[in-house]
Amino acid sequence: MSLNMFWFLPTHGDGHYLGTEEGSRPVDHGYLQQIAQAADRLGYTGVLIPTGRSCEDAWLVAASMIPVTQRLKFLVALRPSVTSPTVAARQAATLDRLSNGRALFNLVTGSDPQELAGDGVFLDHSERYEASAEFTQVWRRLLLGETVNFNGKHIHVRGAKLLFPPIQQPYPPLYFGGSSDVAQELAAEQVDLYLTWGEPPELVKEKIEQVRAKAAAHGHKIRFGIRLHVIVRETNDEAWQAAERLISHLDDETIAKAQAAFARTDSVGQQRMAALHNGKRDNLEISPNLWAGVGLVRGGAGTALVGDGPTVAARINEYAALGIDSFVLSGYPHLEEAYRVGELLFPHLDVAIPEIPQPQPLNPQGEAVANDFIPRKVAQS
């Protein structure tokens, strides 16, 4: 099975070390462009663009990278409860059209009540997933070309429709990650690819089996992906030294503050990440070559595969054997590590190198009439 390898645009900051200003660098448009172009040339399928108040806006960043890349896809966040599904569907179709079919979407419900309140969202965990399920139903139906009337608990639309369809049919793929039962149920019913953070293989296997069974109950087939950091070097010793350097400027106070911030979230996935290290620096290798040091201060994906190219490739193939076909990777700093992964890891894997897409013809059309419909040629009698 050929593997889809993704990289990451660090719109929330980048540098050589975690938890310190030492070794950091400005993340401006030029730097993000360098990373995107490197990923494009090295054969990554796409890049994940993060979302949240600590990040630059993912949609604007993605749009700005379209003209400087050729085949790279952009995995951009959909935010239920923050954006209406109709507006989000229009944005999705436009990004897909402008990128010539290179748009992918990642459903993000949010997990930090404090940040969500700042965005005007006051739903609890269960309510957010209810709203996300309704949002996704409407969003997908609009991209399928339907005129949608929907009266749910959280979402209400009447006569919603798109005038401009996406390039990818029936619609651009939808990704989603969540570890709670309600999150898995949403994934099983409505998304195309379920993402998990990088837990040990036995825990990932358990998740995949649960989601696959729930999807089968809905008559739905689903793909799987995993989000991991990577520290790959020419030798295993060099890789482990690099891992230790990454957290060499971390002090106990910074770790404690970070863990306290993570504790206020209601994300089951974040709780599972934190349980892998319990905020302590000892015993960070939680599974062969799987290191939890990143999660001491970084929210979300907090584990890294560490080793030389063949070793990391063997661990990736272990995950692939569980049914995972997409790997969303990152490393610090992201420009240099994009090359290291491409040069030291890719030769040991069956990587699906994307082709440059051919321009897709768009139907000629006149200006929309009354902002309501596209004029069609009148049949001759």
Swiss-Prot record:
The keyword Cytoplasm does not apply. Its EC number is 1.14.14.5. One of its GO terms (biological process) is alkanesulfonate catabolic process. GO terms for molecular function: alkanesulfonate monooxygenase activity. It catalyses: an alkanesulfonate + FMNH2 + O2 = an aldehyde + FMN + sulfite + H2O + 2 H(+). It comes from the Bacteria. Keywords: Flavoprotein, FMN, Monooxygenase, Oxidoreductase. HAMAP family: Alkanesulf_monooxygen (MF_01229). Belongs to the SsuD family. FMNH(2) which is absolutely required for this enzymatic reaction, is provided by SsuE. Homotetramer. NCBIfam families: alk_sulf_monoox (TIGR03565), PRK00719.1 (NF001939). Catalyzes the desulfonation of aliphatic sulfonates. This is Alkanesulfonate monooxygenase.
